[in-house]
Amino acid sequence: MNKSRHSSRRRSPSIRSDETIDYKNTSLLRRFVSEQGKILSRRMNRLTSKQQRLIATAIKRARILALLPFSNNES
């Protein structure tokens, strides 16, 4: 029997310590948005709950200011 499906190795964090979560940092925010324009879940992003909250509010602010699209319909 397998012990578990999860690997025991440590994954690298998806946000480096020198990166700040800001609505103006669109290159960082695009990593956390799916192809359809949805905010990815915390488990997919490997973020803490505090980081996920900050990312979500930054993405929403960037959408309102037209820095990020609400939906990504580029075909």
Swiss-Prot record:
The keyword RNA-binding applies. It holds the Pfam family Ribosomal_S18. InterPro entries: Ribosomal_bS18 (IPR001648), Ribosomal_bS18_CS (IPR018275), Ribosomal_bS18_sf (IPR036870). One of its GO terms (cellular component) is chloroplast. The keyword Glycoprotein does not apply. It is found in: Plastid, Chloroplast. GO terms for molecular function: small ribosomal subunit rRNA binding; structural constituent of ribosome. GO terms for biological process: translation. Keywords: Chloroplast, Plastid, Ribonucleoprotein, Ribosomal protein, RNA-binding, rRNA-binding. It comes from the Eukaryota. PANTHER family: 30S RIBOSOMAL PROTEIN S18, SMALL RIBOSOMAL SUBUNIT PROTEIN BS18M. Part of the 30S ribosomal subunit. Belongs to the bacterial ribosomal protein bS18 family. HAMAP family: Ribosomal_bS18. This is Small ribosomal subunit protein bS18c. The gene is rps18.
